[in-house]
Amino acid sequence: MTLLALGINHKTAPVSLRERVTFSPDTLDQALESLLSQPMVQGGVVLSTCNRTELYLSVEEQDNLHDKLVRWLCDYHNLDEEEVRNSLYWHHDNDAVSHLMRVASGLDSLVLGEPQILGQVKKAFADSGRGHANASELERMFQKSFSVAKRVRTETDIGASAVSVAFAACTLARQIFESLSTVTVMLVGAGETIELAARHLREHNVQKMIIANRTRERAQRLADEVGAEVIGLGDIDERLKDADIIISSTASPLPIIGKGMMERALKARRNQPMLLVDIAVPRDVEPEVGKLANAYLYSVDDLQSIIQHNLAQRKAAAVQAESIVEQEACEFMAWLRAQSVSETIREYRAQADQVREELTSKALAALRTGGDAEAIMQDLARKLTNRLIHTPTKSLQQAARDGDDERLHILRNSLGLE
């Protein structure tokens, strides 16, 4: 049995290929059934995200194993083998375990240390239940990887610093305001970055959120999710005074918030400070706003410097995380090797028990017929010894006849003679 990981990801293949190798949730059971029907596959888990498609397998080693798996993958997706082959990577046994642990810990992600991948790996494991039901080593590998990912999060700072624009904006807000539970945030736009920012803010219990967007319908969907109020872009001038923090990210070609608008808002607020985080390109906030007293304006470039600093911190933490993964992978493989010999030990013990029961039964029968007890016990001990050492003796003799000194040494060592 061999543990095997194969796949493609954002490092090895463009999105035009990755999107054609994905496994949709609707057809996952069908894919697993097809995969498990391959004679060499004992168990499998399919991980398919926007950045990677990977198969984690328990397989029987055989000739042309890689070719057979590539052929299955390409046949299933109706792809040309040559198109896929150069983008695939393969990891066996210890390397497969290390790879899964790295993936689950966010060490192999497009955004180093991102936490979402652990949830995706857990979901893949759950959704692939039929694929690993009869592959205990595969189940154990995933369960161990989940605990390693948790350890990496706990013992390192891999996820402590913001490395996305949305998260950096929220981190900046939390640094300036002691608590978000007393502030009102206005989010301008309703795109992906604003969605991420809204979710971060909700997690930190912001007092109130106002979403201003050109299309109210899209904004309303996000507002329903995070518990926010929706206004139109034309309402910003009137409502700006209510916001302590403004995070803006639209596709507008012209600024949405100007100096005059901010002056009116600050006057209405009696010059209580306002934080503006403009992450739009082109900018949503006129640069002159940053010159106003009590208006603290940060651009996407300011955030990038924060992100680069934090990314450097994550890379430093990743060194520690890699050490944890290496240690845990080695320990897991040692455990797995010990498990692989357990069945052999059970068979050997059962064989010895069978000999014991056979000879003991004969000895007891002899005792019942009135035979000499001491002679019967001596005979039992002699026969038991001879039967138990018969096979090791034959192995020693054969090794000697073959002139195999290394095998002789191993046999002597295993018998406790060295």
Swiss-Prot record:
Family annotation (PROSITE patterns): GLUTR
GO biological process, one term: protoporphyrinogen IX biosynthetic process from glutamate
Chain residues that bind substrate: 49-52, 109, 114-116, 120
Marked site (Important for activity) residue numbers: 99
Broad class of enzyme this protein falls into: oxidoreductase
Swiss-Prot/TrEMBL catalytic activity: (S)-4-amino-5-oxopentanoate + tRNA(Glu) + NADP(+) = L-glutamyl-tRNA(Glu) + NADPH + H(+)
Keyword line: NADP, Oxidoreductase, Porphyrin biosynthesis
Residues noted as binding NADP(+) in the record, renumbered to the chain: 189-194
CDD domains linked: NAD_bind_Glutamyl_tRNA_reduct
Pfam families: GlutR_dimer, GlutR_N, Shikimate_DH
Regions that span the bilayer: none
Pathway(s): Porphyrin-containing compound metabolism; protoporphyrin-IX biosynthesis; 5-aminolevulinate from L-glutamyl-tRNA(Glu): step 1/2
Gene Ontology MF terms: glutamyl-tRNA reductase activity; NADP binding
Active site feature: 50
Gene3D superfamilies in UniProt: Glutamyl-tRNA reductase, N-terminal domain (3.30.460.30), NAD(P)-binding Rossmann-like Domain (3.40.50.720)
Listed EC numbers: 1.2.1.70
Entry similarity comment: Belongs to the glutamyl-tRNA reductase family.
Miscellaneous notes: During catalysis, the active site Cys acts as a nucleophile attacking the alpha-carbonyl group of tRNA-bound glutamate with the formation of a thioester intermediate between enzyme and glutamate, and the concomitant release of tRNA(Glu). The thioester intermediate is finally reduced by direct hydride transfer from NADPH, to form the product GSA.
Domain notes for this protein: Possesses an unusual extended V-shaped dimeric structure with each monomer consisting of three distinct domains arranged along a curved 'spinal' alpha-helix. The N-terminal catalytic domain specifically recognizes the glutamate moiety of the substrate. The second domain is the NADPH-binding domain, and the third C-terminal domain is responsible for dimerization.
UniProt cross-references to HAMAP family, sorted A to Z: Glu_tRNA_reductase (MF_00087)
Function: Catalyzes the NADPH-dependent reduction of glutamyl-tRNA(Glu) to glutamate 1-semialdehyde (GSA).
Assembly and binders: Homodimer.
The protein, known as: Glutamyl-tRNA reductase
Organism: Cronobacter sakazakii (strain ATCC BAA-894)
Lineage summary: Bacteria, Pseudomonadati, Pseudomonadota, Gammaproteobacteria, Enterobacterales
